[in-house]
A protein has these predicted regions:
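A short, proline-enriched helix->beta-strand linker immediately N-terminal to the Walker B motif
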Residues: 144-148
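Hydrophobic anchor residue at the start of the ABC signature
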Residues: 139
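The feature captures the beta-strand-to-loop junction immediately N-terminal to the Walker
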Residues: 46-48
Length: 255
């Protein structure tokens, strides 16, 4: 894939995508997508199931070589998937340092594991970890590489609601400290609004929405403007909020 034109090359930590397209047979999944993410910006990509969100992220991660268009990414990038893909026969600390060498690697691994709340799990085996703990290892494995760009593909999709809340708080704290550019793929509108500086919606292979999120932080669902933005985004995803309401009991109360 050719690089982006020199006039559009980003500074460190950013991403520039120009006219990216991808087809599978007759089906067009990405249709001329263009996007720039500056250093430090947290961008969330929404879309219906099968909209091409993960296909786009795989292209940016250089995991799909049949994409047309130009993609220029930061030299240091890291990817976190829904399945952290830990090596089962390596202890936690060795999963974090996988593929790295140097005198300070072990020290740095201990530091990042401490940052994600796993300072006492250095010698643990992956099979002993909960889903949330395994995903924390995935984040630590990304952090130790000191990435300028972090790509996350529905990383919390398989976690329970309480663990997701904790992971949201952790991810926001880590982003505030390290300030990489972030592209976070999800189908969860509430998650997008809670985390994003900017929200994109992929529809029919194109970006139908590109909106800055101006809500004050920290955000909760009662933050002024949250519900308005939620309704707007759900509409773009083809969801009527009325469809999400709980059915009423016979006496008229919600169940």
């Amino acid at each position: 894939m050719p690089p982006a034109p020199d006039g559009h090359r980003p500074g460190p930590g950013s991403l520039v995508v120009g006219g990216v397209s991808r087809s599978f047979g007759e089906r067009v999944v990405l249709d001329g997508v263009s996007l720039t993410i500056p250093h430090g910006q947290f961008v969330v990509l929404l879309g219906r199931s099968g909209s091409g969100k993960s296909t786009f992220l795989r292209a940016v991660a250089d995991l799909d070589h049949d994409v047309e268009g130009s993609i220029h990414v930061a030299a240091r990038r890291a990817v976190v998937f829904q399945d952290p893909r830990l090596v089962p026969w390596k202890r936690v600390i060795h999963n974090v340092t996988l593929g790295l060498a140097g005198r300070d690697v072990k020290r740095r691994a201990r530091e990042v594991l401490e940052e994600v709340g796993l300072g006492d799990h250095l010698r643990a085996w992956p099979a002993t970890l909960s889903g949330g703990e395994a995903q924390r290892v995935g984040l630590a494995r990304a952090l130790i590489r000191e990435p300028d760009l972090v790509l996350l593909d529905e990383p919390f999709g398989a976690l329970d609601a309480l663990t997701r809340i904790k992971m949201h708080a952790l991810l926001q704290a880590l982003h505030l400290k390290y300030r990489p550019a972030v592209l976070f793929v999800t189908h969860d509108v509430d998650e997008a609004i809670l985390l994003a500086d900017r929200i994109l919606v992929l529809e029919d292979g194109r970006l139908a929405v590109d909106e800055e999120v101006g809500l004050a932080r920290p955000r909760i669902r009662t933050t002024p403007g949250f519900q308005r933005l939620r309704t707007e985004l759900l509409g773009h995803l083809g969801v009527d909020e009325g469809e999400l309401a709980e059915p009423a009991e016979p006496d008229g109360r919600a169940g």
